[in-house]
Amino acid sequence: MIRDINLTKRQKCVIDNTELEFLSRDSFPLFCGCVESDLKDDLICEQEWVVSKEGVIQLKNLIPLEILYANGHDAGTVGSLWEEHHREFANFIIKSDPKNVLEIGGGHGKLSQNCLSLADIKWTIVEPNSENKHKNVDYIDGFFHKEIFNNRCFDTVVHSHTFEHIYNPHEFLEEISSVLMGGG
């Protein structure tokens, strides 16, 4: 289904604000079979790849987040490689002895459950559409931005396979810093 979508168009490199050069353009199904709806009902979007002089490849046309993440798809939950990833990342996190963790984009809860099996931690997940909520985790339904925390602070902020989905990485990192105890 082709539908007009109000895309955000990058004019400069998201990392260093330099000019972008066209690489390629193609049409693609937005949800690519990651949801249960029929592929014929998928949204067809134009994917335009651009590159900066420094070699940073990025999408030029950005789908509005409320459309892109309207449904959860629990990526990163199936298979032994993902299970090992969450176990190893949990072991890494536990080494810093966290007490109050914010996980950004951890809708499936695998990382939280691995960490909570190892230590007593207050764990909060911010996720736009978490479907299977664990009772031992605090959930904030929405996209990450500092205003949703009402001045709450965390001693640790984690995210796994989330950064590549962030449209404004500088702003994202600044906002993470603002919710960390001591300002990061």
Model-derived features: where do they sit?
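N-terminal juxtadomain amphipathic helix
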Residues: 2-81
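Extended interfacial segments that mediate partner engagement and assembly in macromolecular machines
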Residues: 43-48, 55-129, 136, 141
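Local beta-strand N-terminus motif with an aromatic residue
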Residues: 98, 154-155
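Conserved short alpha-helix immediately C-terminal to the canonical SAM/SAH-binding motif I
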Residues: 130-132, 172
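Short conserved loop adjoining the S-adenosyl-L-methionine
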Residues: 146-152
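A conserved beta-strand element that flanks and buttresses the S-adenosyl-L-methionine
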Residues: 158
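A short His-aromatic
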Residues: 161-165
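A short glycine-rich, Lys/Arg-flanked "PGG" loop and its adjoining helix->strand segment in the class I
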Residues: 170-184
